[in-house]
UniProtKB/Swiss-Prot annotation:
It comes from Corynebacterium aurimucosum (strain ATCC 700975 / DSM 44827 / CIP 107346 / CN-1) (Corynebacterium nigricans). The gene is rpsJ. Involved in the binding of tRNA to the ribosomes. Keywords: Ribonucleoprotein, Ribosomal protein. This is Small ribosomal subunit protein uS10. One of its GO terms (molecular function) is structural constituent of ribosome. PROSITE patterns: RIBOSOMAL_S10.
Length: 101
């Protein structure tokens, strides 16, 4: 697998969970002998929702809620079969979305 690259994108609402998952991936990959670039923090996506406070009146009074999606990027250079096997066995929280390319 020389000259190849594995790109891992992580997404989560909780920044602590995504940082812990990224650290776990980096430690696992470095133990197998592959080179790691990252984790690179990508821009945080922020969705703001405005909801009317009253059930039927006072449209000017609104409450704002936001959801932040934190993203990280990890590149694995020159992965070995041992690296790929270790990545398949790694256990990450359900709140972290993992996309491997």
């Amino acid at each position: 697998m020389a000259g190849q690259k594995i790109r891992i994108r992580l997404k989560a609402y909780d920044h602590e969970a995504i940082d812990a998952s990224a650290k776990k991936i980096v430690e696992t990959v470095t133990r197998t002998g592959a080179r790691v670039v990252g984790p690179v923090p990508l821009p945080t996506e922020k969705n703001v929702y405005a909801v009317i406070r009253s059930p039927h009146k006072y449209k000017d009074s609104r409450e704002h809620f936001e959801m932040r999606t934190h993203k990280r990027l990890i590149d694995i250079l020159d992965p070995t079969p041992k690296t790929v096997d270790a990545l398949m066995r790694i256990d990450l929280p359900a709140s972290v979305d993992v996309n491997i390319q």
